[in-house]
Each structure stands twice: as C-alpha cells, then as structure tokens.
Curated annotation (Swiss-Prot):
This is Selenoprotein W. Coiled coil: none annotated. Plays a role as a glutathione (GSH)-dependent antioxidant. May be involved in a redox-related process. May play a role in the myopathies of selenium deficiency. The lineage of its organism: Eukaryota, Metazoa, Chordata, Craniata, Vertebrata. The keyword tRNA processing does not apply. Expressed ubiquitously with predominant expression in the pituitary, spinal cord, sciatic nerve, cerebral cortex, cerebral nuclei, thalamus, cerebellum, muscle, cartilage, trachea, gizzard and artery. Weakly expressed in pancreas, testis, ovary, kidney and veins.
Length: 85
C-alpha cells in the first residue's frame, strides 16, 4: 500500500508549480511507493504544508518556507524513509 504524502498549498498564490516540482522529485526518489495528493486553497493563505502519513513534516506557515533547499528536501525524504516499511 503506497504511503500518502499530502501537500496543502496556496492555490490563489500560484504555488501549484512548486507542488508539482516537489511531487516529481519525490516520485523519482520513491517510484511506486507514494500516493501524492496536492490540494490548493481557494483563498490566499500562503500555505505550503507537507504531511507524510499523518505527520506534518514541513510547514511554510510555521516558518519552514518553501522546499527550496536540499536540507529541506532531505528532511521530507527522511520522514518518508522512516514511514515506509
């Protein structure tokens, strides 16, 4: 059963391409192992929240910014590796 990774992003802010880049990178690293779900908000929220399983692992709202550095990506990758059987 694939591991669910959910990204809640600000649709009104135009963050969908950022979600698409993250999704492509994670699917390349974990082929067939993830169920990626992206949800854009209707209103301006500024959100870019990444949840692995039921655990929030990256939050722009809480100060993490975008997934724009290798260190931020590695934190998400590590959370996925820890959650996979």
């Amino acid at each position: 059963m694939p591991l669910r990774v959910t990204v809640l992003y600000c649709g009104a802010u135009g963050y969908k391409p950022k979600y698409e880049r993250l999704r492509a990178e994670l699917e390349k690293r974990f082929p067939g192992a993830l169920e990626m779900r992206g949800q854009g908000t209707q209103e301006v929220t500024g959100w870019f929240e990444v949840t692995v399983g039921s655990r929030l692992v990256h939050s722009k709202k809480n100060g993490d910014g975008f997934v724009d550095t290798d260190a931020k990506l590695q934190r998400i990758v590590a959370a996925i590796q820890a959650a996979l059987p």
